[in-house]
Swiss-Prot record:
Subunit structure: Homotetramer; dimer of dimers.
Organism: Rhodopseudomonas palustris (strain BisB18)
Official protein name in the record: S-adenosylmethionine synthase 1
GO cellular component: cytoplasm
Annotated residues for binding of Mg(2+): 17
Keyword list, A-Z: ATP-binding, Cytoplasm, Magnesium, Metal-binding, Nucleotide-binding, One-carbon metabolism, Potassium, Transferase
GO biological process, any: one-carbon metabolic process
Enzyme Commission identifier(s): 2.5.1.6
Gene (UniProt): metK1
Region (Flexible loop): 99-109
UniProt cross-references to PROSITE patterns, sorted A to Z: ADOMET_SYNTHASE_1, ADOMET_SYNTHASE_2
Free-text function comment from the UniProt entry: Catalyzes the formation of S-adenosylmethionine (AdoMet) from methionine and ATP. The overall synthetic reaction is composed of two sequential steps, AdoMet formation and the subsequent tripolyphosphate hydrolysis which occurs prior to release of AdoMet from the enzyme.
Amino acid sequence: MREHCVTSESVTEGHPDKVCDQISDGILDACVAQDPASRVAVETLVSGNIAVIAGEITTTAQIDAERTARAVIKAIGYDDPALGFDSDSCFILTNLRTQSPDINLGVSRGDELGAGDQGVFYGYACDETANLMPIPIALAHTLSLRLTMMRRDGTLPWLRPDGKVQVTMRYGRDGRPCGLDSVVVSAQHDEAVDRDTLVRGLVEGVIYPELHDWLQPGTRVLINPTGRFVVGGPAGDTGVTGRKLMVDTYGGCAQHGGGAFSGKDATKVDRTAAYMARYAAKNVVAAGLAGRCQLALAYAIGQIDPEMISVETFGTETVDGDRICAAVREVFPWTVSGMIAALELRQPRFRKTAAYGHFGREDQGFQWEKTDRSGELLALCTR
Protein backbone atom coordinates (compact mmCIF):
# COMPACT_ATOMS: atom_id res chain seq x y z
CA MET A 1 0.00 0.00 0.00
CA ARG A 2 1.31 3.45 -0.86
CA GLU A 3 1.32 6.41 1.50
CA HIS A 4 -1.80 8.53 1.18
CA CYS A 5 -3.97 11.10 2.92
CA VAL A 6 -7.59 10.92 4.05
CA THR A 7 -9.66 14.04 4.73
CA SER A 8 -12.88 14.21 6.76
CA GLU A 9 -15.00 17.14 7.88
CA SER A 10 -17.39 17.89 10.69
CA VAL A 11 -19.70 20.82 11.33
CA THR A 12 -21.16 22.34 14.47
CA GLU A 13 -24.81 22.13 15.46
CA GLY A 14 -25.28 25.70 14.20
CA HIS A 15 -24.41 24.83 10.60
CA PRO A 16 -27.52 25.43 8.44
CA ASP A 17 -27.83 21.80 7.30
CA LYS A 18 -27.47 20.59 10.87
CA VAL A 19 -30.09 23.05 12.08
CA CYS A 20 -32.44 21.33 9.65
CA ASP A 21 -31.45 17.84 10.78
CA GLN A 22 -32.10 18.78 14.40
CA ILE A 23 -35.48 20.33 13.66
CA SER A 24 -36.54 17.24 11.70
CA ASP A 25 -35.37 14.89 14.45
CA GLY A 26 -36.87 17.13 17.12
CA ILE A 27 -40.27 16.74 15.49
CA LEU A 28 -39.69 12.98 15.20
CA ASP A 29 -38.87 12.80 18.92
CA ALA A 30 -42.01 14.78 19.78
CA CYS A 31 -44.10 12.23 17.89
CA VAL A 32 -42.34 9.15 19.26
CA ALA A 33 -42.56 10.45 22.84
CA GLN A 34 -46.35 10.20 22.66
CA ASP A 35 -46.76 7.45 20.06
CA PRO A 36 -43.76 5.11 19.69
CA ALA A 37 -45.25 3.64 16.50
CA SER A 38 -45.38 7.02 14.74
CA ARG A 39 -44.58 7.03 11.03
CA VAL A 40 -42.55 10.14 10.31
CA ALA A 41 -40.72 11.53 7.30
CA VAL A 42 -40.00 15.24 7.87
CA GLU A 43 -37.74 17.53 5.85
CA THR A 44 -36.68 21.04 6.84
CA LEU A 45 -35.25 23.96 4.88
CA VAL A 46 -33.84 27.12 6.43
CA SER A 47 -32.88 30.23 4.49
CA GLY A 48 -32.44 33.70 5.89
CA ASN A 49 -34.95 34.10 8.70
CA ILE A 50 -37.33 31.51 7.24
CA ALA A 51 -37.84 27.81 8.00
CA VAL A 52 -39.97 25.46 5.90
CA ILE A 53 -41.06 22.14 7.39
CA ALA A 54 -42.68 19.56 5.12
CA GLY A 55 -43.31 15.86 5.06
CA GLU A 56 -45.57 13.03 6.06
CA ILE A 57 -46.61 12.04 9.57
CA THR A 58 -49.06 9.36 10.66
CA THR A 59 -49.39 9.36 14.44
CA THR A 60 -51.80 9.58 17.35
CA ALA A 61 -49.48 12.16 18.94
CA GLN A 62 -50.65 15.73 19.29
CA ILE A 63 -47.64 17.89 18.44
CA ASP A 64 -46.96 21.51 17.54
CA ALA A 65 -44.28 21.35 14.84
CA GLU A 66 -43.70 25.10 14.82
CA ARG A 67 -43.26 25.27 18.57
CA THR A 68 -40.89 22.31 18.48
CA ALA A 69 -38.84 23.93 15.73
CA ARG A 70 -38.52 27.21 17.62
CA ALA A 71 -37.37 25.36 20.73
CA VAL A 72 -34.69 23.53 18.74
CA ILE A 73 -33.50 26.73 17.07
CA LYS A 74 -33.22 28.48 20.44
CA ALA A 75 -31.39 25.55 22.05
CA ILE A 76 -28.80 25.60 19.28
CA GLY A 77 -28.03 29.24 20.05
CA TYR A 78 -29.97 31.22 17.47
CA ASP A 79 -31.72 33.45 20.00
CA ASP A 80 -30.48 36.88 18.92
CA PRO A 81 -31.98 38.84 15.98
CA ALA A 82 -28.49 40.19 15.25
CA LEU A 83 -27.59 36.73 13.91
CA GLY A 84 -30.09 37.15 11.07
CA PHE A 85 -31.95 34.01 12.13
CA ASP A 86 -33.52 33.61 15.54
CA SER A 87 -36.08 31.46 17.28
CA ASP A 88 -38.55 34.21 18.10
CA SER A 89 -38.76 36.19 14.87
CA CYS A 90 -38.17 33.59 12.15
CA PHE A 91 -41.11 32.82 9.87
CA ILE A 92 -42.01 29.11 9.87
CA LEU A 93 -44.12 27.49 7.16
CA THR A 94 -45.36 23.92 7.72
CA ASN A 95 -46.85 21.44 5.26
CA LEU A 96 -47.31 18.10 7.01
CA ARG A 97 -49.55 15.35 5.61
CA THR A 98 -50.23 11.70 6.44
CA GLN A 99 -48.11 8.86 5.09
CA SER A 100 -49.04 7.54 1.66
CA PRO A 101 -51.42 4.55 1.97
CA ASP A 102 -49.37 2.78 -0.71
CA ILE A 103 -46.26 2.95 1.49
CA ASN A 104 -48.24 1.94 4.56
CA LEU A 105 -49.48 -1.12 2.66
CA GLY A 106 -45.91 -2.41 2.45
CA VAL A 107 -44.80 -1.43 5.95
CA SER A 108 -47.75 -2.71 7.98
CA ARG A 109 -47.51 -6.49 7.65
CA GLY A 110 -49.31 -7.76 10.74
CA ASP A 111 -46.93 -8.86 13.49
CA GLU A 112 -43.90 -7.99 11.35
CA LEU A 113 -42.96 -4.73 9.66
CA GLY A 114 -41.89 -4.45 6.06
CA ALA A 115 -39.10 -2.13 4.98
CA GLY A 116 -40.29 1.42 4.34
CA ASP A 117 -38.16 1.73 1.20
CA GLN A 118 -35.66 -0.08 -0.96
CA GLY A 119 -31.93 0.60 -0.90
CA VAL A 120 -28.44 -0.47 0.11
CA PHE A 121 -27.03 0.53 3.50
CA TYR A 122 -23.55 0.36 4.97
CA GLY A 123 -21.96 0.11 8.39
CA TYR A 124 -18.25 0.37 9.14
CA ALA A 125 -15.77 0.01 11.97
CA CYS A 126 -11.98 -0.01 12.24
CA ASP A 127 -9.37 -0.24 14.96
CA GLU A 128 -7.88 3.24 14.50
CA THR A 129 -9.59 4.69 17.59
CA ALA A 130 -11.01 3.49 20.89
CA ASN A 131 -14.57 3.94 19.61
CA LEU A 132 -13.67 2.01 16.44
CA MET A 133 -14.15 4.95 14.09
CA PRO A 134 -11.79 6.24 11.38
CA ILE A 135 -9.46 8.72 13.02
CA PRO A 136 -10.00 11.64 10.57
CA ILE A 137 -13.74 11.87 11.29
CA ALA A 138 -13.22 11.13 14.99
CA LEU A 139 -10.82 14.07 15.34
CA ALA A 140 -13.02 16.34 13.23
CA HIS A 141 -16.04 15.65 15.44
CA THR A 142 -13.96 16.25 18.55
CA LEU A 143 -12.93 19.67 17.27
CA SER A 144 -16.40 20.75 16.15
CA LEU A 145 -17.90 19.67 19.47
CA ARG A 146 -15.21 21.59 21.33
CA LEU A 147 -16.01 24.70 19.29
CA THR A 148 -19.56 24.48 20.58
CA MET A 149 -18.45 23.81 24.16
CA MET A 150 -16.15 26.85 24.13
CA ARG A 151 -19.05 28.97 22.89
CA ARG A 152 -21.59 27.61 25.35
CA ASP A 153 -19.46 27.86 28.49
CA GLY A 154 -18.27 31.37 27.64
CA THR A 155 -14.57 30.49 27.32
CA LEU A 156 -14.56 32.01 23.82
CA PRO A 157 -17.51 34.43 24.11
CA TRP A 158 -17.06 35.81 20.60
CA LEU A 159 -17.88 32.47 18.96
CA ARG A 160 -21.23 32.11 17.19
CA PRO A 161 -23.18 28.90 16.42
CA ASP A 162 -21.95 28.10 12.89
CA GLY A 163 -18.65 26.35 12.26
CA LYS A 164 -16.82 23.76 10.18
CA VAL A 165 -13.74 21.63 10.74
CA GLN A 166 -11.63 19.62 8.30
CA VAL A 167 -8.90 17.14 9.24
CA THR A 168 -6.41 15.56 6.83
CA MET A 169 -4.55 12.52 8.17
CA ARG A 170 -1.53 10.85 6.58
CA TYR A 171 -1.45 7.06 6.32
CA GLY A 172 1.74 5.04 5.94
CA ARG A 173 2.51 2.07 3.71
CA ASP A 174 1.14 -0.21 6.42
CA GLY A 175 -2.25 1.47 6.11
CA ARG A 176 -2.05 2.98 9.59
CA PRO A 177 -2.42 6.70 10.45
CA CYS A 178 1.03 8.19 10.90
CA GLY A 179 0.65 11.95 11.10
CA LEU A 180 -1.64 14.95 10.91
CA ASP A 181 -1.16 16.67 7.56
CA SER A 182 -3.49 19.62 8.06
CA VAL A 183 -6.43 20.96 10.04
CA VAL A 184 -8.88 23.64 8.97
CA VAL A 185 -11.17 25.42 11.42
CA SER A 186 -13.77 27.89 10.19
CA ALA A 187 -15.65 29.41 13.12
CA GLN A 188 -18.38 32.04 12.99
CA HIS A 189 -17.47 34.95 15.23
CA ASP A 190 -18.59 38.30 16.55
CA GLU A 191 -17.63 41.21 14.32
CA ALA A 192 -15.77 42.97 17.13
CA VAL A 193 -13.13 40.29 17.77
CA ASP A 194 -9.73 40.95 16.21
CA ARG A 195 -7.99 38.24 14.21
CA ASP A 196 -5.07 37.76 16.63
CA THR A 197 -7.47 37.09 19.50
CA LEU A 198 -9.52 34.73 17.34
CA VAL A 199 -6.53 32.71 16.11
CA ARG A 200 -4.94 32.49 19.55
CA GLY A 201 -8.23 31.48 21.14
CA LEU A 202 -8.93 28.72 18.61
CA VAL A 203 -5.39 27.34 18.68
CA GLU A 204 -5.07 27.36 22.47
CA GLY A 205 -8.69 26.60 23.35
CA VAL A 206 -9.79 24.21 20.61
CA ILE A 207 -7.02 22.78 18.42
CA TYR A 208 -4.13 22.14 20.79
CA PRO A 209 -6.13 20.52 23.63
CA GLU A 210 -7.61 17.95 21.22
CA LEU A 211 -4.77 17.43 18.72
CA HIS A 212 -1.57 17.89 20.73
CA ASP A 213 -0.64 14.22 20.32
CA TRP A 214 -0.87 14.53 16.52
CA LEU A 215 0.47 18.01 15.82
CA GLN A 216 3.90 18.00 14.15
CA PRO A 217 6.20 20.77 12.89
CA GLY A 218 4.92 20.20 9.35
CA THR A 219 1.22 20.20 10.22
CA ARG A 220 -0.61 23.00 8.42
CA VAL A 221 -3.20 24.84 10.52
CA LEU A 222 -5.69 27.08 8.72
CA ILE A 223 -8.10 29.20 10.75
CA ASN A 224 -10.91 31.09 9.01
CA PRO A 225 -8.96 31.08 5.73
CA THR A 226 -11.11 33.86 4.18
CA GLY A 227 -10.19 36.12 7.11
CA ARG A 228 -13.77 36.79 8.17
CA PHE A 229 -16.77 34.65 9.18
CA VAL A 230 -19.32 37.01 10.72
CA VAL A 231 -22.37 36.20 8.61
CA GLY A 232 -23.18 32.54 9.19
CA GLY A 233 -25.88 30.03 9.85
CA PRO A 234 -29.11 30.29 7.82
CA ALA A 235 -28.46 34.03 7.37
CA GLY A 236 -25.44 33.15 5.25
CA ASP A 237 -26.35 29.82 3.64
CA THR A 238 -29.50 27.86 2.95
CA GLY A 239 -29.69 24.58 4.85
CA VAL A 240 -31.60 21.38 4.07
CA THR A 241 -32.18 18.16 6.00
CA GLY A 242 -29.97 15.23 5.00
CA ARG A 243 -27.18 17.11 3.26
CA LYS A 244 -24.26 16.13 5.49
CA LEU A 245 -24.09 12.38 4.82
CA MET A 246 -20.33 11.97 5.28
CA VAL A 247 -20.40 14.05 8.46
CA ASP A 248 -23.20 11.84 9.76
CA THR A 249 -21.34 8.59 8.99
CA TYR A 250 -17.65 7.81 8.48
CA GLY A 251 -16.15 10.91 6.90
CA GLY A 252 -15.85 9.29 3.48
CA CYS A 253 -13.87 6.29 4.75
CA ALA A 254 -16.68 3.85 3.93
CA GLN A 255 -19.29 3.43 1.23
CA HIS A 256 -22.66 5.15 1.55
CA GLY A 257 -25.95 4.09 0.02
CA GLY A 258 -27.17 7.67 -0.39
CA GLY A 259 -30.03 7.73 2.11
CA ALA A 260 -30.11 10.35 4.86
CA PHE A 261 -31.12 9.66 8.46
CA SER A 262 -32.74 12.66 10.14
CA GLY A 263 -36.49 13.11 10.24
CA LYS A 264 -37.14 9.42 9.55
CA ASP A 265 -38.78 7.00 11.98
CA ALA A 266 -37.44 3.52 12.62
CA THR A 267 -39.43 1.82 9.84
CA LYS A 268 -37.24 3.72 7.38
CA VAL A 269 -34.36 1.35 6.65
CA ASP A 270 -32.24 4.29 5.47
CA ARG A 271 -31.73 4.86 9.16
CA THR A 272 -32.36 1.57 10.95
CA ALA A 273 -30.37 -0.68 8.61
CA ALA A 274 -27.41 1.71 8.68
CA TYR A 275 -27.46 1.67 12.48
CA MET A 276 -27.65 -2.13 12.57
CA ALA A 277 -24.84 -2.43 10.04
CA ARG A 278 -22.63 -0.25 12.28
CA TYR A 279 -23.60 -2.38 15.29
CA ALA A 280 -22.54 -5.58 13.55
CA ALA A 281 -19.36 -4.15 12.03
CA LYS A 282 -18.27 -2.67 15.36
CA ASN A 283 -18.74 -5.98 17.15
CA VAL A 284 -16.73 -7.81 14.48
CA VAL A 285 -13.79 -5.46 15.06
CA ALA A 286 -14.25 -5.46 18.86
CA ALA A 287 -14.08 -9.26 18.80
CA GLY A 288 -10.69 -9.11 17.09
CA LEU A 289 -12.05 -10.87 14.02
CA ALA A 290 -10.87 -8.05 11.72
CA GLY A 291 -9.09 -4.72 11.86
CA ARG A 292 -11.59 -3.18 9.44
CA CYS A 293 -15.12 -4.28 8.66
CA GLN A 294 -17.73 -2.92 6.28
CA LEU A 295 -21.16 -4.48 6.29
CA ALA A 296 -23.62 -3.95 3.43
CA LEU A 297 -27.38 -4.57 3.59
CA ALA A 298 -30.04 -4.34 0.89
CA TYR A 299 -33.79 -4.21 1.44
CA ALA A 300 -36.84 -4.07 -0.83
CA ILE A 301 -39.87 -1.99 0.11
CA GLY A 302 -42.50 -4.00 1.91
CA GLN A 303 -40.20 -6.97 2.52
CA ILE A 304 -39.42 -8.23 6.01
CA ASP A 305 -35.95 -9.71 5.45
CA PRO A 306 -32.92 -8.23 3.69
CA GLU A 307 -32.18 -9.06 0.08
CA MET A 308 -28.44 -9.06 0.84
CA ILE A 309 -26.03 -9.24 3.76
CA SER A 310 -22.39 -8.79 2.77
CA VAL A 311 -19.29 -8.51 4.97
CA GLU A 312 -15.98 -7.04 3.71
CA THR A 313 -12.87 -7.09 5.91
CA PHE A 314 -10.28 -5.77 3.42
CA GLY A 315 -7.76 -8.52 4.12
CA THR A 316 -7.61 -7.70 7.84
CA GLU A 317 -9.60 -10.75 9.00
CA THR A 318 -8.09 -13.13 11.57
CA VAL A 319 -10.45 -16.01 10.71
CA ASP A 320 -12.06 -17.12 7.47
CA GLY A 321 -14.32 -14.41 6.06
CA ASP A 322 -17.15 -16.83 5.35
CA ARG A 323 -17.25 -17.73 9.03
CA ILE A 324 -17.49 -14.07 9.98
CA CYS A 325 -20.39 -13.53 7.58
CA ALA A 326 -22.20 -16.64 8.84
CA ALA A 327 -21.76 -15.53 12.45
CA VAL A 328 -23.03 -12.03 11.68
CA ARG A 329 -26.13 -13.50 10.06
CA GLU A 330 -26.78 -15.68 13.10
CA VAL A 331 -26.03 -13.27 15.96
CA PHE A 332 -27.93 -10.17 14.82
CA PRO A 333 -31.62 -9.81 13.91
CA TRP A 334 -32.10 -8.61 10.34
CA THR A 335 -35.87 -8.24 10.04
CA VAL A 336 -37.13 -4.67 10.29
CA SER A 337 -39.03 -5.42 13.52
CA GLY A 338 -36.03 -7.27 14.94
CA MET A 339 -33.66 -4.39 14.23
CA ILE A 340 -36.01 -1.83 15.76
CA ALA A 341 -36.33 -3.88 18.95
CA ALA A 342 -32.62 -4.67 19.25
CA LEU A 343 -31.60 -1.04 18.71
CA GLU A 344 -34.33 0.37 20.98
CA LEU A 345 -35.56 2.72 18.27
CA ARG A 346 -39.01 3.35 19.69
CA GLN A 347 -37.55 5.87 22.13
CA PRO A 348 -37.47 9.67 21.59
CA ARG A 349 -33.72 10.20 21.34
CA PHE A 350 -33.16 10.82 17.65
CA ARG A 351 -32.28 14.48 18.03
CA LYS A 352 -29.16 13.44 19.95
CA THR A 353 -27.88 11.83 16.75
CA ALA A 354 -28.44 14.90 14.59
CA ALA A 355 -25.14 16.69 15.29
CA TYR A 356 -21.53 15.47 15.66
CA GLY A 357 -22.17 12.14 13.94
CA HIS A 358 -24.53 9.22 14.35
CA PHE A 359 -21.65 6.83 15.06
CA GLY A 360 -18.83 6.71 17.59
CA ARG A 361 -20.94 8.53 20.20
CA GLU A 362 -20.39 6.09 23.06
CA ASP A 363 -21.31 8.70 25.67
CA GLN A 364 -24.90 8.83 24.39
CA GLY A 365 -25.84 5.23 25.20
CA PHE A 366 -26.84 4.29 21.66
CA GLN A 367 -27.33 0.54 21.37
CA TRP A 368 -25.53 0.39 18.02
CA GLU A 369 -22.36 1.62 19.70
CA LYS A 370 -22.23 -1.22 22.20
CA THR A 371 -19.94 -4.22 21.74
CA ASP A 372 -22.09 -6.65 23.71
CA ARG A 373 -22.29 -9.16 20.85
CA SER A 374 -18.53 -9.46 20.28
CA GLY A 375 -18.11 -12.47 22.57
CA GLU A 376 -20.85 -14.40 20.81
CA LEU A 377 -19.34 -13.60 17.41
CA LEU A 378 -15.90 -14.72 18.55
CA ALA A 379 -17.24 -17.96 19.97
CA LEU A 380 -19.05 -18.82 16.73
CA CYS A 381 -16.03 -18.02 14.58
CA THR A 382 -13.50 -19.98 16.65
CA ARG A 383 -15.40 -23.06 17.75
